[in-house]
Amino acid sequence: ERIQQLRQYDRRIFDLEDEINRKLSKLDAALQRCNIRLSNYVSNTDSKSYKEVVARISEGITDPKVLVEEIHGRIINRHGRKTIIAALTGVITQADSDMMRQIREEIDIAERHKQECIDKMQEICEKEYSDQLRNLQTIPGVKLRAATSLIAEIGIDMSHFETANHLASWSGLKPRNDESNKVIKSKRITHGNRYLRRTIIECSWAASRTQGCFFSRFSYHQTQ
């Protein structure tokens, strides 16, 4: 029953993340329509500078010389103050400001709900599965959020998976065996559990950037 609850929270988190990404894309489209090209210069549309600029615009502040004060100094140094001011210069109507405010509020609500689910998962795992939670976090690339997600999607009874290959196959990360008359038609991965697959892929990327571990060295040699 506890695993089922964790799974509900976990999949809700993934749905909320997708929703937030869609809203961020909508927000950027609204800015682009006003000829504001800030996304060309910030690392991503979820950055603090980007959010602060949107907040000021939704409050009715449209002067680029005022908006540029919300941009991180590193971005200004990299691209130049004049370039950033030009990117913040656009034509913004009252309707545009209202739409941005509404989208921003929707993102804030989704982020709050996401954090509530994360807190609930952490609370359950620390109470019921503290040993498994601690052990999972010793794996390179696996932090608290990933550990709770793995417990939710896999459970704690590993007797269901005889080998690591069985688990990889269940998550959909094992290439399919589509061969006929010694001709390989496809090596695409199977469908599997898309939530588990997403978590494992995120962990593998994190592990490839963890200094001193095998995955980091393997990833480096693969790119050479």
Task: Outline where the language-model segments fall.
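A detector of single, family-specific signature residues
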Residues: 1-224
